[in-house]
Design a protein with these regions (language model features):
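Hydrophobic/aromatic side-chain positions at a characteristic register within alpha-helices
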Residues: 115, 134-135
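Structural register within alpha-helical repeat arrays
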Residues: 129-130, 164
Length: 166
């Protein structure tokens, strides 16, 4: 009865090994295909000529969201940063990869667009921290103005929403 049991185990082991080998090769083919697709798209994106970016939806910081007449060192730092950002170009490019940016606007614009996106990231972080500090020092009305502005420009900082809800 147990005489053929060894053969059964050997047969099952071989079948399982072949299934594993098949799945590994299938995964490898898919991975190679995805890599080739990525690099082909990247190569196409690298050939796109510079496009006009002057008419993009740039974010402007209104004076009404810059805290003034508040004697708090932390708020003064945020004010300085906001004033510096006010003079710069700011774009919300969240959700776009470098390849997406190169395809849409050309390789030559990538560094400028990256800078504008970094300005946006700085802005939304400053808005969240400034709003939190204003709440700490009891200026909830100005905090609400700043946090609502953050939401209006598309911030995804969940803390803004929580602070406004409170």
């Amino acid at each position: 009865m147990f005489k053929n049991f060894g053969w059964v185990i050997l047969f099952c082991t071989i079948i399982i090994g072949m299934l594993i080998l098949y799945e590994c090769k299938k995964h490898s083919r898919k991975s190679d295909s995805a890599k080739a697709s990525f690099w082909a798209r990247e190569a196409r994106a690298n050939t796109v000529r510079r496009k006009d970016i002057s008419n993009l939806n740039y974010i402007n910081i209104p004076d009404s969201v810059i805290p003034s007449d508040i004697s708090d060192d932390e708020i003064n730092e945020y004010r300085t940063t906001l004033l510096n950002l006010q003079a710069r170009k700011i774009l919300n490019l969240s959700g776009l990869t470098n390849t997406d940016l190169k395809e849409k606007y050309g390789v030559a614009n990538l560094s400028a667009l990256s800078e504008y996106d970094e300005n946006y990231i700085t802005l939304v972080n400053i808005i969240a921290r400034c709003g939190a500090r204003l709440i700490e020092i009891g200026n909830c009305s100005l905090a609400a103005v700043i946090l609502e502005y953050g939401i209006s420009i598309g911030t995804d900082v969940s803390r803004n929403y929580y602070m406004l809800a409170e």
